[in-house]
Swiss-Prot record:
SMART domains: Elp3
Cofactor or coenzyme needed: [4Fe-4S] cluster
Domain Radical SAM core stretches: 142-364
Gene Ontology terms, MF aspect: 4 iron, 4 sulfur cluster binding; lipoate synthase activity; metal ion binding
Cystine connections: none
Reactions this protein catalyses: [[Fe-S] cluster scaffold protein carrying a second [4Fe-4S](2+) cluster] + N(6)-octanoyl-L-lysyl-[protein] + 2 oxidized [2Fe-2S]-[ferredoxin] + 2 S-adenosyl-L-methionine + 4 H(+) = [[Fe-S] cluster scaffold protein] + N(6)-[(R)-dihydrolipoyl]-L-lysyl-[protein] + 4 Fe(3+) + 2 hydrogen sulfide + 2 5'-deoxyadenosine + 2 L-methionine + 2 reduced [2Fe-2S]-[ferredoxin]
Alphabetical list of InterPro entries matching this protein: Aldolase_TIM, Elp3/MiaA/NifB-like_rSAM, LIAS_N, Lipoyl_synth, rSAM
Region (Disordered): 21-43
Secretion signal, residue range per the UniProt entry: none
Pathway given in the UniProt record: Protein modification; protein lipoylation via endogenous pathway; protein N(6)-(lipoyl)lysine from octanoyl-[acyl-carrier-protein]: step 2/2
The protein's name: Lipoyl synthase 2, mitochondrial
Binding-site list for [4Fe-4S] cluster 1: 127, 132, 138, 375
Entry-linked SUPFAM superfamilies: Radical SAM enzymes
Amino acid sequence: MFHRHLCKLCSKTPSAATLASPLGKLQEERGEGVAKDPKKDKQHRQIFLQKFRERLDSDTTGKNTLAGFIDLPEGISPTMAAVGPLKRGEEPLPPWLKMKVAKGVSRLPRFNRIRNSMREKRLATVCEEAKCPNIGECWGGDEEEGTATATIMVMGSHCTRGCRFCSVLTSRTPPPLDPDEPQKVANAVAEMGVDYIVMTMVDRDDLTDGGAAHVVRCVNTIKEKNPLLLLEALVGDFHGDLKLVETVALSPLSVYAHNIECVERITPNVRDRRASYRQSLKVLEHVNSFTKGAMLTKSSIMLGLGEKEEEVRQTLRDLRTAGVSAVTLGQYLQPARTRLKVSRYAHPKEFQMWEEEAMAMGFLYCASGPLVRSSYRAGEYYIKSLVKQRGAAATKSNTTTTTTTTTTTTTTNTASLAAATVTDSATLQGE
């Protein structure tokens, strides 16, 4: 009971320190150091607000309004609200990159089939992980023509490299490979009902072969279950080991894709130090020379990282010299605050210019646009026809080679037999 009374006394009596200070004396005079009557306090507030309103209403100079207290830029009103204020130095997103998601996409049978299959088997897709704006277009596809495409990422979700443009998680010691992954991917692809699939990978520098053997197992398992499927593999550089590149190129792929990413000058600032511009070119060139042009090769360039026009042009020339047949160009968009900032937003007309120049250089296929990504509409009609033409040409070449070899062998054997007969006849006559 005594404690309760003491608490009440303390709450009403100002402290010695408060009374000793000039501010404390002022508070005491105003009655701020002691408990107040809530009703009186409310009345004081109402009176103050009423007087303040009257003051604003009676003012004719405009100095007592909100605009009179702050300096605003021209064209901005004091009541204008900005949603998501830009940070200093950031450029606003241009209108051509503000893409609305098509209504009803999630109700498309093929879109749902792909999404459900991926989630049930707990497989990662670049489409969802990167929040690709083209997901509805690629997953929905054309139900009759079968142009739907999905990009599956294998070998886990942790990459051993730390490229400054990529939002994929980085780890020096990622989890071990899933031995059942090839079969899971093959089953998922079969359930999707697509006729073109893109399979990409994280870099695994912790593995001796960089994951090349695992990639080959995935490709073989997918093709065994889906023989007519066209398969594009977007793979890494495998430490620059060309023997490992050959191992992957020998698998039943339709398209061998490896991204150059950006122009040579800015590569050290954009990509991981273990990835280089010249190494990527060497990989692509070796695939073409090793397969004697039978394998369709593909690469991709990002704009908006600080490149110059002539540098982009030179990169296209380098890719074409390396034998690359298909190329894509798209706008780099910062995936997270910790990643590289966008240096500029290229206009759609610029992308159109690069597409025209690429085709003039001799590329068989070029997709160029602000929202284009490396696997954008990979399964569209034209690139599928290119793959089939290459496959038919390779089969014809092998058949011709086999026929020629057989004919040569038969001719040689016949000539040898004829020579032996003549020799035997001469021997008999001599006897």
